[in-house]
A protein has these predicted regions:
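Conserved histidine-centered catalytic loops in small-molecule metabolism enzymes
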Residues: 185
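GST-like domain detector, emphasizing the conserved glutathione-binding G-site
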Residues: 1-107
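GST-like fold's C-terminal all-alpha helical module
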Residues: 83-171
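A local structural micro-motif
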Residues: 7, 159, 177-178
Length: 185
């Protein structure tokens, strides 16, 4: 989104590449993602990484990925945090891979999953204003749309407002570019 050039190295979590010594020597937490700048600075946790990039590359002609307005920024950070730390049943029964690859539809969702789906939909309907969470698009919009897309790709019916929101996010140039790179590997 900011138009920064970078190199991406894929880490195979299924094969626990993040637990191998070569990755652990770069990122002591063994967490993914990890941002490495030169050989002497690494940062893990996506929220910390996006906050760092926003603050380092602000007012230099780069697009903002968070609202400038302090209230809008706080709400976006809260949304990112809840998407990252909550909705564990959704993440368990509808893993990220289901967003990219069609999986066998499971009509027998757990009761806990149904509760989480309803809570996610309520949260999204409340915080998504006309188009975005804040006045303009932010990285929190993508994080929320990614979680909502888990539902959509698993054939969960969501309100049209949320379908449109997910579609708007996934049609952004930066997201389409990321998907193209991801699909080429």
């Amino acid at each position: 989104e900011k138009g920064l050039s970078f190199d991406e190295t894929m880490v195979d979590l299924d094969n626990k590449e993040n637990k191998l010594l070569n990755y652990g020597s770069i990122c002591l937490s063994e967490k993914v993602p990890c941002l490495q700048i030169n050989d002497n600075f690494t940062l893990f946790e996506s929220l910390a990484i996006t906050e760092f990039l926003e603050n380092k590359f602000i007012n230099n002609g780069f697009e903002n990925i968070y609202p400038v307005d302090i209230c809008g920024r706080a709400i976006c950070c809260a949304i990112q945090s809840v998407v990252k730390t909550d909705f564990l049943q959704i993440k368990k029964e509808m893993p990220s891979i289901t967003v990219f690859e069609r999986q066998q539809h499971n009509p027998n969702w757990s009761t806990d999953l149904e509760k989480e789906i309803n809570r996610l939909i309520r949260l999204a309907e409340f915080y998504i204003k006309e188009q975005w969470i804040a006045e303009k698009w932010s990285i929190a919009d993508f994080d929320l749309s990614f979680m909502l897309n888990r539902l959509i790709q698993n054939q969960i019916v969501v309100p049209e407002k949320l379908m449109d929101y997910v579609e708007r996010n996934w049609q952004r140039h930066s997201i389409q570019s990321w998907l193209a790179v991801r699909n080429s590997k």
